[in-house]
Amino acid sequence: MNNSRPIVVAFLLVVMVFILSCSKNTLTGKSQLSFIPEKDMQSMSYTQYKDFLKTHEVLSPQKDANAAMVQKVGARITKAIERYFKNSNNSAALTGYNWEYNLVNDKLVNAWCMPGGKIVVYTGILPITQNENALAIVLGHEVSHALLQHGTQRMSQSMLQQVGGVALSVALSTKPAETQDMFLRAYGVGSAVGFTLPFSRKHELEADQYGLIWTVMAGYDPTEALAFWDRMEKSSKGNTPPEFLSTHPSDVKRKEKIKAFLPEAMKYKGK
């Protein structure tokens, strides 16, 4: 009896799952692991976003200057993204995006973007951003993670490991709590779960680069990214690392890559 046959069969099945689960990202054109349709992720996003806002203090832009600033910067980043996709004859890639920016009163140093353009900024990160330019860096970076479908890839990996790669609807009906937790972790909603998963260095570099492009196109200064990450790192010295750093690891090499990409990002000024 050949004891290796079951192992070979299992290996081939895993390979088939990966091949069938690969799709092309509409922004980069690169293949990625994603067996969850974007429309399903957006549908879940809208539900989770509403639930999150119901359980947190959302600051009104009519009454709070910082909330108004988040809305203002967010609107400019959104217009920049829409121009970029229009100039690339790729506006269809934004189908289902219903942009929404909210500031919540929470000391957590964090910000995130769910599929479909659902963004939350925590007041705890504002002492580190300090200005509109740095806030644009943060928003551009977070929106890029969503447009690049990094969270979808992470959730696909988690579902493959934990529920065998079944359809999202099946996972929600059979293991609703676990599936919702996977979704929240995949998008760095740290206050809703006990831990979050760090983005890979590859994902971070992609989000940094596209985020800088949106920042420039929106009329902000991209060089503020270097000062922002310096302040972020200083804020963690001697203390528990901010939630933002747990999902967005930073180091000297990263800042070097950001600095090296700035000339390329500046080519998008005025576009």
Task: Locate predicted features.
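A Zn2+-metalloprotease active-site environment signal
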Residues: 7-9, 22-271
